[in-house]
């Protein structure tokens, strides 16, 4: 149990100084020495915090607590009677006859007390709320505190709050414990604590499983925690100040104190840092851990590393093999790995070459390190001379770190982390030294063979090219017929454009005519001789997609006719050129407006609601009302085009799948799509269905309402948070909010949350969504938790788009294309 492992004599005080003003204690004081009834409160001197009775969201129970007074969202940071609520307004907070601060109900039963031994009386002690959020009990004639809430936190850490241990005076760990639910502040399932062993580390523990570790931060080096995910590597820019006084103390302070912020233990098991945004007038998430599946403690067992950017996540360290190969191959990695070749000192005959080290770069260091102040060469030398030593590391602020026994909870990081040296038998080290020579020899021979084959193939191709050109279109339509299983003759009615016609229409595919870039290739605006404007999608030879997607799109869209689907006018197949010709959408794509503060003003709420309805009708046609059942698989704001009347049209069917009438879902090993819009079952397991399109639809709904992009799933987490807090008006784009439409806007947010629920079976069908939008279904169920897919959680997948305007991570793309 982690809470009893601490051996440090220091007190660790976490100073998260995120307030704008520095004031004296005298200025912060807000006193009370009598009693507070249910309707009465006290406020700190600069009105930052308030103390009194409150009711949590969706609850009528009353609790005594402290909350932020200076923000518009109810934010409780400390609760007194957390597991003994009062069911009416009869509660009283008072200083009792023995000088303690107590909370009593209408029958004068004591529900909570500071419970300190004091010689003071009720008349000589006062309660004081400081502007730091600390509630203190003290003698009126002295500045010495008898009791303070900062030493007894509930679920939140504030600036100057004690979060460590004080071994010299026999103190235990100071922890924060989650609420049971957003409406119930009684102790929940998770606890967080800063444990002081060889190095300070933050831990999250599961109270329902013998305080087992859920997550650890990695060791602190004086600047940051080693094991934070890369996206948060710079969040903990604190500095430790060690004061070697009679009590011993360790403090942390922010490098940036210009933002109001605090940490809290979420009831689902995450430690979250919340930062106040004056612009949004709401809290934003500055940090949330665990952040990836690899953050789960011991995810891969012993002697293995976890990499959230790889599939599978876990791999044995070189020189080790799975302990149970069958379980390992089935994705159960908890058994970990075991050493292949014993170390020199472990062999019966310990002669021969000495052991060496394998260097693993940018690692979250394993748990249970021992500390030494040796230099790096001396650190490694000491490890080799100690039979029990299996790994070592050295870094600024860490000194020499040594591991004995086993290595657990290692993770490969892409930017932060520290080099870890794994001790291996000499034969394991030699294996790697020979590998480059072998690879080089194979490559040299391979290059020669490939070159010869290319020359031969080129001569054959040149001879056959003339014969091939006449059959290009025929071959394409044969593939179309095979895929569609339909009427080849009807597909051939699709107009074929000459290459020269499209080249002339697009000004020879000039950059000035380029509208955007997709996985298929570039998209150009064109104008035919008769004056009709068109959009031309040209297959890029460098595209990771291409011919298969072109054929797929012809199959799908040639059979569809709906006012909310983009219209295919024809195609061009000439030599190596493959192009699709669409009607031109003059208003570009939906994302062109939503995520630009100036252009967003052009879409008022009525327009946005009509766009939502149009998208739903188009998707309903694909799923249920057309002759085929089609799953789009790449529904997103940039694939919603707008005509001159701002009528939405779903586009880009290159990734769509046609479903047989008797199937509801399918599985693929080739996960394609756009990060932020992919349903969890599809992103993580390749399983797609109508409900995966519904998830994408829900993301689009929330983006339309908020005007914010779902980057790294932060939008879903944010919406869920404010939904639970009853502050959903803060989500709505200020450009569209109108009290006249408030009920309709709230309904759309509600529907959006239903669409992005984690379990596919919980999501409504598109037909149900349409009925809810039209008020045919009045009783809308409460949503369950959305799927928060961390970017690093998504296995390597193929992107549906490639653009100069993108941030591409793990081949799952965040697109920023202006439309067709």
Swiss-Prot record:
Region entry CaM-binding, spans? 598-615
Membrane protein topology class = Single-pass type I membrane protein
Superkingdom field: Eukaryota
Tell me the active site.
634 (proton acceptor)
**Enzyme Commission number(s) of this protein:** 2.7.11.1
Record's signal peptide: 1-26
The PAN domain extends over 345-425
Segments traversing the membrane = 437-457
**Protein name, as recorded:** G-type lectin S-receptor-like serine/threonine-protein kinase At1g11300
Q: Which organism is it from?
A: Arabidopsis thaliana
């Amino acid at each position: 149990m982690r809470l009893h492992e601490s051996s440090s004599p220091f007190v660790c005080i976490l100073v998260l100084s995120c307030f704008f003003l520095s004031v004296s204690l005298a200025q912060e004081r807000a006193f009370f020495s009598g009693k507070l009834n249910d309707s009465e409160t006290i406020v700190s001197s600069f009105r930052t915090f308030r103390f009194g009775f409150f009711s949590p969201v969706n609850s009528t129970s009353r609790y005594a607590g402290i909350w932020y007074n200076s923000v518009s969202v109810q934010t409780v940071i400390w609760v007194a009677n957390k597991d003994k609520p009062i069911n009416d307004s009869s509660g009283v907070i008072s200083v009792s006859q023995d000088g303690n601060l107590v909370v009593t109900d209408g029958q004068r039963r004591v529900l909570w007390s500071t419970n300190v031994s004091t010689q003071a009386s009720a008349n000589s002690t006062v309660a004081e709320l400081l502007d730091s959020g600390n509630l203190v009990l003290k003698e009126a004639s002295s500045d010495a505190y008898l009791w303070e809430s900062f030493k007894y936190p509930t679920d939140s850490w504030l600036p100057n709050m004690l979060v460590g241990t004080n071994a010299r005076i026999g103190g235990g760990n100071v922890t924060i414990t989650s609420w049971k639910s957003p409406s119930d502040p009684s102790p929940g399932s998770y606890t967080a604590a800063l444990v002081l062993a060889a190095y300070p580390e933050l831990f999250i523990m599961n109270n329902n499983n013998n305080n087992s570790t859920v997550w650890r931060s990695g060791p602190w080096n004086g600047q940051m925690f080693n094991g934070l995910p890369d996206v948060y590597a710079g969040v903990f820019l604190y500095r430790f100040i060690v004061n070697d006084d009679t009590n011993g103390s360790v403090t942390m302070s922010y490098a940036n104190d210009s933002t109001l912020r605090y940490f809290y233990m979420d009831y689902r098991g995450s430690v979250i840092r919340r930062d106040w945004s004056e612009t949004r007038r709401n809290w934003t998430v500055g940090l949330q851990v665990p952040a990836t599946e690899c953050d789960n403690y011991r995810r891969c067992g012993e002697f293995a590393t976890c990499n959230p950017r790889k599939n599978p996540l876990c791999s044995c360290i070189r020189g080790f093999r799975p302990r149970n190969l069958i379980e390992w191959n089935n994705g159960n990695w908890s058994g970990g790995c075991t050493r292949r070749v014993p170390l020199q000192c472990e062999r019966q005959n310990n002669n021969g070459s000495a052991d060496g080290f394998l260097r693993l770069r940018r690692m979250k260091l394993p748990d249970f390190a021992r500390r030494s102040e040796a230099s790096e060469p001396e650190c490694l030398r000491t490890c080799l001379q100690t039979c029990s030593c299996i790994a070592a590391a050295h870094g600024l602020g860490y000194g020499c770190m040594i591991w004995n026994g086993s290595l657990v909870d290692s993770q490969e990081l892409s930017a932060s982390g520290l080099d870890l040296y794994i001790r291996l038998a000499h034969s394991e080290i030699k294996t790697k030294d020979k590998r480059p020579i072998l690879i080089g020899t194979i490559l040299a021979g391979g290059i020669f063979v490939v070159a010869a084959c290319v020359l031969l193939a080129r001569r054959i191709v040149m001879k056959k090219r003339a014969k091939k050109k006449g059959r290009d279109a025929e071959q394409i339509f044969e593939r179309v017929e095979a895929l569609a299983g339909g009427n080849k003759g009807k597909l051939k009615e699709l107009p074929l454009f000459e290459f020269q016609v499209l080249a002339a229409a697009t000004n020879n595919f000039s950059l000035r005519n380029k509208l955007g870039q997709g996985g298929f290739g570039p998209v150009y605006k064109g104008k035919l001789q008769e004056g009709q404007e068109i959009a031309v999608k040209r297959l890029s030879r460098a595209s990771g997609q291409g011919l298969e997607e072109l054929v797929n799109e012809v199959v799908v869209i040639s059979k569809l006719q709906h006012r909310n689907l983009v219209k295919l006018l024809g195609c061009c197949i000439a030599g190596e050129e493959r192009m699709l010709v669409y009607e031109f959408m003059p208003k570009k794509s939906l994302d062109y407006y939503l995520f630009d503060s100036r252009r967003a003003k052009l879409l008022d709420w009525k327009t946005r609601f009509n766009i939502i309805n149009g998208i739903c009708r188009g998707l309903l046609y694909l799923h249920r009302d057309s002759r085929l059942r089609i799953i789009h698989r790449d529904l997103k704001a940039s694939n919603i085009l707008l005509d001159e009347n701002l009528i939405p049209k779903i586009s880009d069917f290159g990734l769509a799948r046609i479903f047989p009438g008797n199937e509801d879902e399918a599985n693929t090993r080739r996960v394609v799509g756009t990060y932020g819009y992919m349903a969890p079952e599809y992103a993580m397991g390749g399983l797609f269905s109508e409900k995966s399109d519904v998830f994408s639809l829900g993301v689009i709904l929330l983006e339309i309402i908020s005007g914010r992009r779902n980057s790294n799933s932060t939008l879903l987490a944010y919406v869920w948070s404010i939904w639970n807090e009853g502050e959903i008006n803060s989500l709505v784009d200020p450009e569209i909010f109108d009290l006249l439409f408030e009920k309709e806007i709230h309904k759309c947010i509600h529907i959006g949350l239903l669409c992005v629920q984690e379990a596919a079976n919980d999501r409504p069908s598109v037909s149900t969504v349409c009925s809810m939008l039209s008020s045919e279904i009045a009783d809308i169920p409460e949503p369950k938790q959305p799927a928060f897919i961390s970017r690093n959680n998504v296995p390597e997948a193929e992107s549906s788009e490639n653009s100069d305007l993108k941030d591409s991570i793990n081949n799952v793309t965040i697109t920023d294309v202006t439309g067709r």
